[in-house]
A protein has these predicted regions:
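A glycine-rich helix N-cap at a beta->alpha junction
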Residues: 232-236
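Metallocofactor- and cofactor-centric catalytic cores in central/energy metabolism, strongly enriched
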Residues: 1-214, 218-230
Length: 236
């Protein structure tokens, strides 16, 4: 058996919509004893040790040094200015009575201005979006957001999980083939660099693991894989 990791983990979420708000509500509800983490491998899954007949099946969270759910700290970005309570209420995924119990906690989670390009999500409009000189500037703004969050929250490390809308399908282009080309593309505002790639670049540049929760191209390009290798950062 092993002791739980006692550090605080920041969960950075680009795209604070139905998926993200439901995830956050679920974690907080579990932490307050209002629900159970059904479906969570780390929290409810077990691992078999030795032979089947030995009946040694500890929970994964007791065997691997995972961060306790109470030590998860959330922040994120979106293209509309709402707090997580308002987003969850509008999404109509969870029951209102549960949301009312969680309301004080959810309202504290403010949403940061998002990186937005209508070319990649044509049916959406944003009123809470970043502006900058170029896409490199937008990436630097995301990194500044993360640094500010680190200071205010006291987290020890972070992960980033893309929960935004699925972007339009695209094939890799020359700008995606190397890190040098990609960074030049950021400076020149190249149209083939999607918002999800800007977030991923910012995360990987800071050594923050990036998980893609949508079938976007994002980190499935040589440029960002090169950056991940350079900073020794996972891209699961």
């Amino acid at each position: 058996m092993t002791e739980n990791n006692k550090s605080k983990l920041g969960v950075l979420i680009p795209g604070m919509g139905s998926v993200a708000s439901t995830f956050i509500c679920g974690v907080i509800a579990c932490n307050r004893g209002l629900s159970k983490p059904i479906g969570s491998m780390t929290q409810m899954g077990s691992i078999r040790l030795g032979k089947r007949t030995e009946n040694r099946n500890p929970l994964i969270k007791d065997f691997v040094p995972t961060v306790d759910m109470n030590d998860l700290v959330f922040t994120g970005w979106d293209i509309n200015q709402e707090n997580v309570y308002d987003i969850a209420l509008k999404s109509k995924v969870l029951k209102n009575d549960l949301l009312e119990e969680l309301k004080p906690h959810l309202q504290k989670i403010n949403v940061l201005k998002g990186v937005f390009d209508k070319k990649y999500v044509r049916r959406l409009n944003g009123n809470w979006v970043k502006s900058g000189e170029n896409k490199l500037d937008l990436a630097k703004q995301v990194m500044a957001d993360i640094e500010s969050f680190n200071e205010s929250s006291g987290v020890d490390s972070n992960v980033m999980i893309w929960c935004g809308s699925t972007e339009v399908y695209m094939e890799p282009s020359e700008i995606h083939l190397s890190l040098d080309a990609f960074e030049e593309g950021l400076k020149s505002n190249h149209e083939d660099i999607a918002p999800s790639m800007i977030y991923a670049y910012a995360a990987l540049k800071m050594g923050i693991p990036f998980a893609n929760g949508a079938p976007n191209l994002t980190v499935d390009i040589p440029a960002l894989q090169e950056l991940a290798n350079k900073t020794n950062t996972p891209i699961p």
